[in-house]
Amino acid sequence: MLVMSLSTMLAQSQTLQPPAQLSLFMEGTVSTNLNERDMALSPDGSEMYYTLEAAQNAFSTILYRHKLPGNKWSAPEVAPFSGQFKDLEPAFSADGRRLFFSSNRPLSGTQAKDFDIWVVERAKDGSWSSPRNVGAPVNTKANEFYPSVALSGNLYFTSEYEKGVGKEDIYVCQWQDGKYTESVALDTAVNSKLWEFNAFVSPDEKFILFTSYGRKDDHGGGDLYISLRDAAGVWQPAKNMSMLNSPRLDYCPFVSFDQKILFFTSGRHDLPSTYEKPTTHAALVKAYNSVRNGSENIYWIDFQALVGSLK
């Protein structure tokens, strides 16, 4: 049933045409001088959800935009299920009927708690249900971040469990007999003794994109890596996606469901570390209010061309 639904959705026209070279995504409207991260595009390409985050992670909320006639997009709005607690990292199921995200909202009342994985479900009229905590064994007393769900129902996410391989790891809870199994850390082809986090798994679980920090081939701030899964279901040693990475943090990858577009978040900037001569207040204000001012932005690129360069 899921496969049929996904095939139908991918047959629909995709009007977003990704650039061959890495570029800011919708500069000035999605990527601005604020902190934007965590792109999630619906399977049919008609909706986008992403996170708007305050400085120093003081608050985060999920924004929503939908496609209008003429290949235009609506103005951003706070998603109907967000805006009260720290919400971030939206991720669609492959059938578009569920949207997972991470939140510190309480199970009841108004007192914030640790971060858990939550989900909203699509009603027949297109509206979203009230958020539901995914529950154990996915959620624990620790933090769970950055959900990514496969066609099988398997749920991948990030946490810092003591049972892990390193300081922060990528886990999977398999979906079996209508429920999740206990979380298992991916093996050392993906996880290491360092930090691995914010993974996107393809719907067929044939590849996984994630960020790692501190590896010998790291550009300095945390890099994007890719691991392929062989026919036996074994993850292969991850490779640094050096053509994308920068000295800043590059993370939060997402590939559109037709596998044409790669989105990710980066804090790279155009600000100089020195000036040839003393600058002015006006020049500083202009620079600090620019899009590439060191705030996080969403970037995009043609994923198929990128895959070809990785072979």
Map each language-model feature to its residues:
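Bacterial Sec-dependent N-terminal signal peptides
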Residues: M1-Q17
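Short, conserved micro-motifs composed of acidic
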Residues: Q14-K311
